Amino acid sequence: MANIIKVRDDYEPIQFESTSGLNKFKICEGSSASWTDQEFTVKDLRSRIEPWLTSLFQSEHLSLLVGAGLTHAVHYLAANKAAAGMSALDLNNYKDEIDNRAKESAEKAGRKEGNLEDQLRVANELLRGLEILGDSKADNLRDELNGGMKDFAQSILSSENGIVTANEDKREQAFNTLVTFLMSFASRIGVRERLNIFTTNYDRLIEAGAEIAGLHLLDRFLGNLMPIFRSSRLDLDMHYNPPGIRGEPRYLEGVARYTKLHGSVDWVQTDRDIRRIGLPFGATDITPFFQTPSLYGATAHELMIYPNAAKDRETAGYPYVELFRDFASAVCRPNSVLVTYGYSFGDEHINRTIRDMLTIPSTHLVVISYDDPLDRIMQIYNEMGRPSQISLMIGAELADLTKLTQNYLPKAAIDKTTFRMSELLKQRMDPMQSDKEHKKQETTASDTGLEEL
């Protein structure tokens, strides 16, 4: 697959591919670029991409949307294979009806085939209808759904476990790359608004990376032993008092707001509340962690994995309505930048919000993706019709996690030494550039004088 780049003042996406030389590329037939000849190197790409991303990352409002691509990338670095995917539910009751309806739902959302989430949505709707009718088949379907949810949770845990149990050197390299990735976005000076991290993933990979990096994540949960999900959105933050200065708290650096749009493998509905249970990263089985009196005999069917909403009738869609509202309020603002990594644009809720965001002229969308097998990203790009507000980095040469962090993402540092060095280099380079321009003008003038003689 060819790589696609569109940054800065590129009018349209540019396709390029590798040549026989190491780290050398050429423009594909049918594409053209004003900033390079037919062939160029990684150094040329870096000088094109890195300053652009650096300026975008220091915008007034910055949000990062992470999809399954990040989990697969880190898992591949650690275990040399992709993470477990979402396999279809194995049902005996109403299998054909559920599969057909799930496929219809997927096609309406612009996807060719239904996935596990589509099946869960349809199966839960059917189960609710059978319960209303008092049909005896409701018990059988509920048992099958419970087993399917347990298998799905098990596949999520196996992906986490695959990273934890990988070779120590590879595991350390994978987590170091993840930390560099996260801190490239989170390294914002304290007076800027906090980075907003959104993810559609159910695993806890970002939480693990943030813990290693020392990055504080603020979410809607309150408490320590079994944090409870709060419906009210309180803009809590972290501050510190500088030594010797009282009454002037300053923002603590290394803080980000975190939202899991599709729920998490460790969120469980308990009676009227949603709680986050103490499920260790890399655990092999979730069942033992349900064996506590405070969970009221919960099973895998009570896991908050989208679209498995809370079961009381008056809050259909809870807590996902609140989570999607957080996403919309964070990105649909002037001077807002949204960066997506590993997101395939398969969720119409999210796509609709992104479309609304781009109606604000000062917003910008950066799409970073390892591939686009269904051509969904380019289809969305063309449908939105706002090329000047969208940057694209698609392909293994641009979006491979190691190459991305080493070559293209901004340096994950906001220390004063870095800023002082940048200013010093700028001051030194300006006089040098002026001298070069002055000498060039003198040479041109003398050549012109000789020609006149």
Predicted regions and their residues:
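Gly/serine-rich nucleotide phosphate-binding loop at the start of the catalytic core
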Residues: 1-210, 216-217
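SIR2/sirtuin-family catalytic core signature
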Residues: 1-64, 110, 114, 248, ...
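Short beta-strand/turn micro-motifs composed of small residues
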Residues: 66, 199, 262, 367-369
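Short, glycine/serine-rich, charged loops/turns that create anion-binding
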Residues: 69-70, 202, 263-265, 345, ...
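A short acidic (Asp/Glu
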Residues: 73-79, 205-211, 270-272, 348-354, ...
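Extended, H/D-rich, highly charged conserved domains that either
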Residues: 80-82, 107-142, 187-303
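Flexible internal linker/loop segments at domain or repeat junctions
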Residues: 282-325, 330
